[in-house]
Amino acid sequence: MSWLFGLNKGQQGPPSVPGFPEPPSPPGGSGDGGDKNKPKDKWSNFDPTGLERAAKAARELDQSRHAKEALNLAKVQEETLQLEQQSKIKEYEAAVEQLKNEQIRVQAEERRKTLNEETKQHQARAQYQDKLARQRYEDQLRQQQLQNEENLRRQEESVQKQEAMRKATVEHEMELRHKNEMLRIEAEARARAKVERENADIIRENIRLKAAEHRQTVLESIKTAGTVFGEGFRAFISDWDKVTATVAGLSLLAVGIYTAKNATGVAGRYIEARLGKPSLVRDTSRFTVAEAVKHPVKISKRLLSKIQDALEGVILSPKLEERVRDIAIATRNTKANKGLYRNILMYGPPGTGKTLFAKKLAMHSGMDYAIMTGGDVAPMGREGVTAMHKVFDWAGTSKRGLLLFVDEADAFLRKRSTEKISEDLRATLNAFLYRTGEQSNKFMLVLASNQPEQFDWAINDRIDEIVHFDLPGLEERERLVRLYFDKYVLQPASEGKQRLKVAQFDYGKKCSDLAQLTEGMSGREISKLGVAWQAAAYASEDGILNEAMIDARVADAIRQHQQKMEWLKAEGKENAAKESGKNPLQPLLEGTPV
């Protein structure tokens, strides 16, 4: 509306309104349009009332006192419209720019797709060309291989032909040479035969002369040798001094050989009895010359060691401890007074301290000890008798007295009436009975067995005292647990030299609890528990033995002990079943005293 109030004079006229028609052309215009393009027809329906109302409203607005405000309002509206138009133009321009950018992006995308497609086409073309090249190369290799094979075949055929020709040539040459050789040999044989026929009388004469000369030479040699030997023997016989000296020399030579042979045997047996160790002896406190040279410090300590307590390190029940202490005191006094030693039988379950007490008894009494096992006797066969005599001969040479400890004695000291014993073992048993028939002041016999009822009756007759080693009770088990816990755990941990530490818990209470849990276990099984605790600590990551690890090892040991007991019960049932099928008179026929 600004043009209506005379504003924006420098601008163009009002814009054309689409709803209003164009003004009529002047009458002098061209009449090409005909009658239907006349102004009369075009403006015949025009209504000017609208323009009149607009003009009237403009006059009223000019005359109004609010004309200035209306003018300002119109200006503001015009500016607002212009700003809206400019914003629309900017939006249009932004849309155009966006469209251009979109077109550029689309073109770039199309170009990228085109490049990708071209790249794919190039790659496909390159792959196809490479495939063709590979095929051509493979075909060339195949052709070359076929050609090489053909050349090789031809070469082989040529070589075979040459070899055949060479072989034929050599065969022909050998055949010709053979023919020539046969002809030469035939000619030589004919010539030799002709010469021999012509010289037959001369050859026979030469042979006759050579034989006569050889016979004459042999006869002269025999005559000369007989004359020499005859004169020498005659001269020897005629000189009685030479005859006497010769006989004496031969006699002395025979006596020297016999004496040296027997003296060597006697000296060897003496050295073996004094210095050697019998093959049946597994362990002994007596030392040989070789051991003294090899371990001088150990032997010196043993010689300078003081007499130990017989029950040091041995944990037994009070009643049994009192009895074995009496045995130790009696044995020591017997040695001091040079009396006769008493033979002892110790029986009981395995691992109850029989072997340990035997060693302690020997040390307490100031005696030497020797340990042999019954299982070593049976495999020796016929050598068992000799080996048994060597053991007792060796025992009799001890100046300090010898405690001979036979572990698992029931392995060879069985009843002689049973059919299971062999003749060699029976002879060895008889030798043992012969050497132990009387009391001795040289050695003390200590037998250990888990099944003393299998002993021959003569063995029982040679036993002076029987000691039963039973499984440890609650108090003894607690002492054993404390002993081995201190030996295998606390002492290595306190020394600090080994990778072993102990966690903080009540050791005394734990040992008491373990003693209650280990009911029925032997001392050896409890000692193995101590070793198991030490091994568990070494196997841990930090080397610390805690209470849980101890309980785990104890539970495992209890489970193993129960399994062993089940096996023992099953074995007892089998033996009972076998015993029930025996002859009821068999016990009356077994063994008689010797």
Curated annotation (Swiss-Prot):
Q: What Gene Ontology cellular component terms go with this record?
A: mitochondrial inner membrane; mitochondrial nucleoid
GO molecular function list: ATP binding; ATP hydrolysis activity
Report the coiled-coil segments.
51-213
> Spans of biased composition, class Pro residues?
15-27
Record region (Disordered): 1-50, 571-594
| Membrane disposition | Single-pass membrane protein
**Is the Repeat keyword given for this protein?**
no
Q: Kindly list the residue ranges recorded as spanning the membrane.
A: 243-260
Where does this protein hold ATP?
Answer: G348, P349, P350, G351, T352, G353, K354, T355
Which Pfam family is an annotated match for this chain, by its short name?
A: AAA
Q: Which residues lie on this side of the membrane: Mitochondrial intermembrane?
A: 1-242
Localisation per UniProt entry: Mitochondrion inner membrane; Mitochondrion matrix, Mitochondrion nucleoid
* Compositional bias annotation for Basic and acidic residues: 33-44, 571-581
CDD domains per the record? RecA-like_ATAD3-like
* Alphabetical keyword list: ATP-binding, Coiled coil, Membrane, Mitochondrion, Mitochondrion inner membrane, Mitochondrion nucleoid, Nucleotide-binding, Transmembrane, Transmembrane helix
Q: Membrane side Mitochondrial matrix: which residues?
A: 261-594
Keyword Nucleotide-binding on entry: yes
Q: Which domain of life is it from?
A: Eukaryota
UniProt record similarity statement: Belongs to the AAA ATPase family.
Q: What does this protein do?
A: Essential for mitochondrial network organization, mitochondrial metabolism and cell growth at organism and cellular level. May play an important role in mitochondrial protein synthesis. May also participate in mitochondrial DNA replication. May bind to mitochondrial DNA D-loops and contribute to nucleoid stability. Required for enhanced channeling of cholesterol for hormone-dependent steroidogenesis.
Annotated protein name in UniProt: ATPase family AAA domain-containing protein 3
Q: Which species does this protein come from? A: Xenopus tropicalis
